Amino acid sequence: YDLTPAYDLLNTSLHMQGLENSRMALDLFKNEGDFATPFFEANGFYGTVDFMEFAKRIGVVEKRAARFIKLTIDSVPAMEEMLEKSFLSEKGKAEYKKSIQDRAKALSL
């Protein structure tokens, strides 16, 4: 047997009743009390500046973190192509695609 390239990916937001608008399972800065970047305070969701701050705090080189974020945004068409080949219902595919696009847009802001 071979595992699929995305065997560990699961968009839990499609399955969590009442949490449909939650973009992440965990807060990036949970142990930081009331810490929030200006971007998060203004928008209510994480964007590139938040992930860059998180990367800095855990010791990821800035250039590497920026490259990974760009790779993630650039991979959206491949994600959508893989999604179309999935066995999700058409409704599930549409919800998943919207989720991918919303998250990519947040990273692009």
What function would you assign to each model-found segment?
Residues 1-109:
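Anionic ligand-binding catalytic core segments
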